């Protein structure tokens, strides 16, 4: 949103793949960029903020989870309020990120990134989840009433120009100030520094979501087949109610959000050194 349109801005996006392959692709891409630059008498700067006053660079870690048959568990479908499997997976992700927001922050920490995070070019240094108006409304219904009877539909963008047709607007919308944003059928973790491997943040996301899945599976298996549907419903409502503090659809750059995040009890680490303590907590030791 802010300062995003700048001269000679370029982005390079490898094709989505499985975690280990995508991590290798990202490393090879960085090496290739440096080698090709030298070949043309240039230097590829992967530092997050090489020059003061000039926008730095980072990378978006696009994360989703699929079954062995190729089913994307983060695909909400046309009516996400009726998609119980999606809502359960979403609830587990919300729980995971809220429980281990400090570890996510640490996974994207380095000295160069400290100069970028929180500026108007990058997401804030405070981890929060952006779901978009459609899913935010579904979560609100579940928390307030225990069920979601409806979901918002995408609206239409009226251009006002006779030669340009009206365009359908995505119901999930976008928020460039969010560090962990839902974008249609995946999450984008936007805090990662341009010089870093995506191995650490992706492994962290995998680990914290796996823990949430394990806890949910234990609860649902203990409920038995007869009470399974009710147990799923109750678990979704419980997770979303207990961890809704991590959800934020507003301006992540604002000073008001920093104060609000502190009021909610979210971890606020100004820099890399501060975030290291996240690795020594009891919950982190149990996780790893």
Give the ranges of each region predicted by the language model.
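Short, hydrophobic beta-strand segments
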Residues: 10-19, 63, 190-193
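Generic structural "secondary-structure junction" signal
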Residues: 14, 75-76, 182
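A generic structural motif
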Residues: 16-22, 69-71, 78-80, 193-198
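Short, small-residue-biased leader/transition segments that mark boundaries at the very start
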Residues: 2-6
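Acidic, glycine-enriched catalytic cores built around paired aspartates
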Residues: 7-10, 27, 50-51, 57, ...
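Catalytic or ion-translocation cores adjacent to nucleophile or general acid/base/metal-coordination motifs
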Residues: 1, 25-48, 53-55, 64-112
């Amino acid at each position: 949103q802010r300062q995003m349109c700048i001269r000679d801005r370029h982005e390079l996006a490898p094709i989505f793949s499985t975690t280990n392959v995508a991590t290798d692709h990202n490393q090879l891409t960085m090496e290739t960029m440096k080698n090709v630059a030298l070949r043309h008498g240039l230097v590829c700067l992967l530092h997050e903020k090489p020059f003061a006053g000039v926008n730095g660079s980072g990378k978006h870690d696009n994360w989703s989870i699929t079954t062995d048959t190729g089913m994307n568990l983060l695909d909400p479908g046309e009516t996400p309020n009726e998609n119980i499997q999606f809502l359960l997976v979403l609830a587990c992700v919300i729980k995971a990120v809220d429980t281990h927001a400090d570890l996510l922050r640490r996974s994207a920490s380095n000295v160069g990134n400290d100069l970028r995070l929180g500026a108007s070019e990058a997401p804030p240094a405070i981890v929060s989840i952006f779901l978009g108006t459609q899913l935010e409304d579904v979560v609100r219904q579940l928390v307030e009433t225990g069920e979601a009877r409806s979901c918002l539909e995408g609206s239409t963008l009226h251009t006002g120009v006779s030669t340009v047709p009206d365009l359908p607007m995505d119901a999930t919308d976008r928020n460039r100030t969010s560090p962990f944003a839902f974008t249609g059928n995946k999450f984008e973790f936007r805090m990662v520094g341009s010089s870093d491997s995506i191995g650490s943040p992706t492994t962290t996301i995998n680990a914290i979501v796996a823990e949430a899945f394990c806890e949910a599976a234990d609860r649902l298996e203990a409920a038995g087949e007869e009470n399974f549907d009710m147990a799923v419903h109750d678990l979704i409502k419980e997770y979303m109610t207990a961890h809704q503090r991590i959800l934020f659809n507003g301006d992540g750059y604002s000073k008001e959000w920093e104060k609000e995040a502190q009021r909610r009890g979210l971890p606020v680490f100004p820099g890399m050194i501060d975030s290291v303590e996240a690795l020594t907590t009891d919950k982190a030791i149990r996780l790893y």
